[in-house]
Amino acid sequence: MLILDRSSPQIFISNEQQDVSIDLQSAQRLVVLFLELQKVSTDQVYVYFLDDTALAQLHDEQFSDPSPTDTITLPIDKPGIASFPHVLGEAFVSPKAAMRFLEQYTEDQLYHEISRYVVHSLLHMLGYDDQTDEDKRIMQEQEDVSLSFLAEHQALLRPAV
């Protein structure tokens, strides 16, 4: 688990899967720059990279749905709400789901897709939803803007060295 220093938000990153190598510092940088882009202040954010079995189990526990999924978001404190510590939420991501979704991919495409899953969860923490077609369109637009910004700042996920 990697934790950012105390002067910044604490970004807890945990890689509990072995399907895809994840550089924890790149995940940390992605979250920090995303928060800066969105002008969100928080004390803590949690991101867990899980295998399909663990994510399906969590999916069943939280939503009574044992099917595999790509990401689960558990928002905790809404942005702008006073609490200490302010915990924006938890993101649970399956890198293997990105492998399945893409079928054939380059390394860059795979890490871009996994980065999209993290951004998607972070957007849910900010209150974005994807239940209606209009919500999905707005979410996709926000994902694309965020991913472009992160790519421009070399802050997408990358493999561990």
From Swiss-Prot:
GO terms for molecular function: metalloendopeptidase activity; RNA endonuclease activity; zinc ion binding. Gene3D superfamilies: Metalloproteases ('zincins'), catalytic domain (3.40.390.30). It comes from the Bacteria. GO terms for cellular component: cytoplasm. Its main location: cytoplasm. Binds 1 zinc ion. Its EC number is 3.1.-.-. InterPro entries: MetalPrtase_cat_dom_sf_prd, YbeY. Keywords: Cytoplasm, Endonuclease, Hydrolase, Metal-binding, Nuclease, Ribosome biogenesis, rRNA processing, Zinc. Its cofactor is Zn(2+). It is found in: Cytoplasm. Zn(2+) binds at residues 120, 124, 130. GO terms for biological process: rRNA processing. Belongs to the endoribonuclease YbeY family. Single strand-specific metallo-endoribonuclease involved in late-stage 70S ribosome quality control and in maturation of the 3' terminus of the 16S rRNA. This is Endoribonuclease YbeY. The gene is ybeY.
